[in-house]
Curated annotation (Swiss-Prot):
InterPro entries in alphabetical order: KOW, Rib_uL2_dom2, Ribosomal_eS4, Ribosomal_eS4_C, Ribosomal_eS4_central_region, Ribosomal_eS4_central_sf, Ribosomal_eS4_KOW, Ribosomal_eS4_N
Cross-referenced SMART domains: KOW, S4
UniProt protein name: Small ribosomal subunit protein eS4
A single MF term (Gene Ontology): rRNA binding
Annotated Gene Ontology cellular component terms: cytosolic small ribosomal subunit
Transmembrane residue ranges: none
Keywords for the protein's UniProt record, in alphabetical order: Ribonucleoprotein, Ribosomal protein, RNA-binding, rRNA-binding
Similarity comment: family membership: Belongs to the eukaryotic ribosomal protein eS4 family.
Residues of the S4 RNA-binding domain: 42-104
Amino acid sequence: MARGPKKHLKRLNAPKAWMLDKLGGVYAPRPSTGPHKLRECLPLVIFLRNRLKYALTGNEVLKIVKQRLIKVDGKVRTDPTYPAGFMDVVSIEKTNELFRLIYDVKGRFTVHRITPEEAKYKLCKVKRVSTGPKNVPFLVTHDGRTIRYPDPLIKVNDSVQLDIATSKIMDFIKFESGNLCMITGGRNLGRVGTIVSRERHPGSFDIVHIKDSTGHTFATRLNNVFIIGKGTKAYISLPRGKGVRLTIAEERDKRIAAKVAGQ
């Protein structure tokens, strides 16, 4: 009988968003337990080795993190399989680089560099609002943070702008029609658009209808929607493509136009 946590992850079973080649070995780095789920995170070893190419092997990544050079959300992380996830700020002081982990329109974590000003805060989705012992109100965010005494206007599915240094709420964005959101799950992963409407289905999944900046509409489940801005103004910078997914034909036309312009 198996006892205790699983310690291995087969390469074929690793999330597609990690973009590991399936013939590169039998196993993949299994993320440690932490603030993000296994299938929604990116271990530091993959970010440093496969994305940034700062190391060739896992052993080199271990040597980098053990020098206490890598910070996630302002805290030094020395575990190479630490699960960094959506909206986390990864900072490397030695190279003066700052990154925010965010999805591209193909649903993969992209290397998205940000300014020092933007690296001071992150957005967190509110997962739960409740009262604790002695009637102290608190909320729980998507990355496992518990924040006591929040603004009573903050409800589930809203987003809070969190100061990383102090873990204090700077601002919050309501979940309502007309606000900008990013999709964090399902087949529309990584797309950005404004909320059009919300269909309530008690006992089942609420459906949210979203319209992107090119006028395309799509729908997804409520728990896949992450509010990132008031109106059309995003609180964070977006990666290349601005969260607009092109159809295959549109991608082809864009490539041909670029080729013609380059000749």
